[in-house]
Amino acid sequence: MAAETFLFTSESVNEGHPDKLCDQVSDAVLDACLAQDPDSKVACETCTKTNMVMVFGEITTKATVDYEKIVRDTCRDIGFISDDVGLDADHCKVLVNIEQQSPDIAQGVHGHFTKRPEEVGAGDQGIMFGYATDETPELMPLTHMLATKLGARLTEVRKNGTCAWLRPDGKTQVTIEYLNEGGAMVPVRVHTVLISTQHDETVTNDEIAADLKEHVIKPVIPGKYLDENTIFHLNPSGRFVIGGPHGDAGLTGRKIIIDTYGGWGAHGGGAFSGKDPTKVDRSGAYIARQAAKSIIASGLARRCIVQISYAIGVPEPLSVFVDSYGTGKIPDREILKLVKENFDFRPGMISINLDLKKGGKRFIKTAAYGHFGRDDADFTWEVVKPLKFDKASA
């Protein structure tokens, strides 16, 4: 390995992982509430273990929601249809413990629904980050994109019958050798690919390895990144028959790096799933991603991070920060000025500008395979805003 290159790794889990099951249930509840009442205030957590799923939290909504049906439908859609695969959607225990939003929080944030959008305060304090890089068409880190796409492909070949031995739970991890080009990240080659997937009792380790290479890795990872030295760890622990909630307990909000940038950039610690847009953990991270992506797409920098922070009940962010890692065409302070001029970071306005009060089947799509770098009209924060700057002076 040449001296100037380095290795970096990102991981992902697919929709049958117990933590991701919980994220999807929480966002399915949010979708159901917003579909009937766009002003729903939702903070929905989910946990699961063998033969049990529980939803709990604070929800204030005019919507009529059948929580048990949402849980069972979500688990069934993932593929949890029998105890053999880790959970039986139609026969597991479903527990529900939902209360109304605290009146203290309601008064401080939205004045019990009386405040105009521009007056709505942040639902809590916190810090959020957005990140973007020019190393992929999605303006996302390649390690993260490949790990995520491998997980999505595992699910695809399970559901379409290509690899009938697959079961819902699975994890992926990709290590890439990078070149640091003046602060910009240039992928050189894929160093290691790791896949651990749940499977049925009938398949052999050799069959697993052959199918994963042919039907999962080959369609996802561009050949130019693979060479004779690329390392493959395919189900390295051997058997992985017991999975899903039977294998491990699951909780909402446990996969926040997988949801974002795969360890690149930074993370404020707040999870996304099950939260309505007054929760800046979610809406703040979405607008920060849009700002960071727009900086790169507009040619202002090759890589950048944006941080914003909030106080509970206060509409305006306390701080906005931009760092282009030395790749900026103009000074970071000028990029920051453009960001502040072009983006409204007040939570009520983020909701309007990114259309975050729309439910349906929208947010459940974010709850597996990443919230960013997705080509889908519902991912409104991925729409680039052109940022105009004086190229002559740059």
Swiss-Prot record:
Binding positions (K(+)): E45
Family annotation (Gene3D superfamilies): 3.30.300.10
Task: Specify which residues bind L-methionine according to the UniProt entry for this protein.
Answer: E58, Q101, D248, K279
Give its localization. Cytoplasm
Q: Does the keyword Membrane apply?
A: no
**Which pathway does it take part in?**
Amino-acid biosynthesis; S-adenosyl-L-methionine biosynthesis; S-adenosyl-L-methionine from L-methionine: step 1/1
The primary site where this protein sits is cytoplasm
Which UniProt key words apply to this protein? ATP-binding, Cobalt, Cytoplasm, Magnesium, Metal-binding, Nucleotide-binding, One-carbon metabolism, Potassium, Transferase
InterPro entries per UniProt: ADOMET_SYNTHASE_CS (IPR022631), S-AdoMet_synt_C (IPR022630), S-AdoMet_synt_central (IPR022629), S-AdoMet_synt_N (IPR022628), S-AdoMet_synthetase (IPR002133), S-AdoMet_synthetase_sfam (IPR022636)
Using the UniProt record, name the top-level EC class of this enzyme in a single word. transferase
Q: Name one GO molecular function term.
A: methionine adenosyltransferase activity
One Gene Ontology term from the biological process aspect of the record = one-carbon metabolic process
Task: Look up the EC number in the record and give it.
Answer: 2.5.1.6
Cofactor: how bound: Binds 2 divalent ions per subunit. The metal ions interact primarily with the substrate. Can utilize magnesium, manganese or cobalt (in vitro).
Q: Which PROSITE patterns match?
A: ADOMET_SYNTHASE_1, ADOMET_SYNTHASE_2
Q: What is the annotated quaternary arrangement, including any partners? A: Homotetramer.
Q: What is this protein called?
A: S-adenosylmethionine synthase 2
Q: Which organism is it from?
A: Hordeum vulgare (Barley)
Report the gene name. SAM2
